[in-house]
Amino acid sequence: MELENQLSKLHELKNNLKEMGASLCLASLEKKSAELELKMQEAGFWDDVQKAQEVTQEAKRVKDKIDKFKNLNERIDDVEVLKELMEENDEETAKEIISEVKALSKEIDTLKIETILSGEYDRNDAILTLHTGVGGSDANDWTEMLLRMYTRWCEKKGYSLETIDYLPGDEAGVKSVTLKVKGEFAYGYLKAEKGIHRLVRISPFNANGKRQTSFASVEVLPELTSDQDIEINPVDLRIDTYRAGGAGGQHVNKTESAVRITHIPTGIVVQCQNERSQFSNRDTAMGMLKSKLIELKERAHKEKIEDLTGELKDMGWGSQIRSYVFHPYSMVKDHRTNVETSNVNGVMDGDIDNFIIAYLNS
């Protein structure tokens, strides 16, 4: 019975892949790949190293997409041949077919999402910021739990993480943290996480064991590439320096290497303290500011600056995009798509793709 179901699924996957091939415009991709290859062979191509690296990366992305599509088609054909050659009661071949169809289904779903992620910044690296909301020490602890969740998700996706700014809680957890997430489609995927995340649990900080509700916000911005850069008038900036490592002790930097930049016309404030020098911190902070200004420009119809990185106006009741309930029952529910699961431990260990994909498909 399972074999029949998977063979039926195989036919569906073949049709899905055919539709994706049309939407991908495979012929256009192959033409673009050839053009990029010629460009890379031009004299003086490496004169501008940064631009050359971007062209090389784009060429690799285009070729990888073409190769992935062709490989999936070939594997579907191979399964169909295997089915034709399979003898009656051949359990080993049946297991092989079932396993391969399941793998194909997962890979085609991923390709479908990456086809949907066609926005100008979707392929970019991402700047992920977590802020504590309502809930005191519980909320700080909740922010740290979310930090771990996203760290585990990034590890599973093969993305690398770099801490840009980190402010610990007074008693426990994290007040705020900003990370750079490096990897293809990092922004495209993580933009689905923008908003308020709500936790309900028995508080470990309450001696009476009372139930506590905590909130944290997730902001996501694309990191801009050189060809997406924007000019900022220096007179619009106020740049302050301060000592990094606010928790004190041996980690305090004795020089004022941390940088805070305020964009005066909009009131946007960005800061970075984790690079080795004031120059590097300033460079990173400027990149963050440009990303925020780009997103603000794209959402110019919004009236308030809080809308810059999602609906973050009220970090409290009724504003959450997702609820994580640990007590009196176990459930994580996304209020935008109504996708839910009782596997709370799995979610907190980074298994959030079902929420992300459902949102991107909506």
UniProtKB/Swiss-Prot annotation:
InterPro entries with a match to the protein in the record = PCRF (IPR005139), Pep_chain_release_fac_I (IPR000352), Pep_chain_release_fac_I_sf (IPR045853), PrfB (IPR004374)
| UniProt entry tagged with the keyword Oxidoreductase | no
| Post-translational note | Methylated by PrmC. Methylation increases the termination efficiency of RF2.
Localization recorded for this chain is: Cytoplasm
Q: Which GO terms describe its molecular function?
A: translation release factor activity, codon specific
Which Pfam families is this protein grouped with? PCRF (PF03462), RF-1 (PF00472)
Listed A to Z, the keywords are: Cytoplasm, Methylation, Protein biosynthesis
Q: Which cysteines are joined by disulfide bonds?
A: none
Signal peptide start and end residues: none
Task: Provide GO CC annotations from the record.
Answer: cytoplasm
N5-methylglutamine modification, residue list = Q250
Q: What is its main location?
A: cytoplasm
Q: Which family does it belong to?
A: Belongs to the prokaryotic/mitochondrial release factor family.
Q: What's the stated role of this polypeptide?
A: Peptide chain release factor 2 directs the termination of translation in response to the peptide chain termination codons UGA and UAA.
Among HAMAP family, the record links this protein to: Rel_fac_2
| Protein's name according to its UniProt entry | Peptide chain release factor 2
Which organism encodes this protein? Clostridium perfringens (strain ATCC 13124 / DSM 756 / JCM 1290 / NCIMB 6125 / NCTC 8237 / Type A)
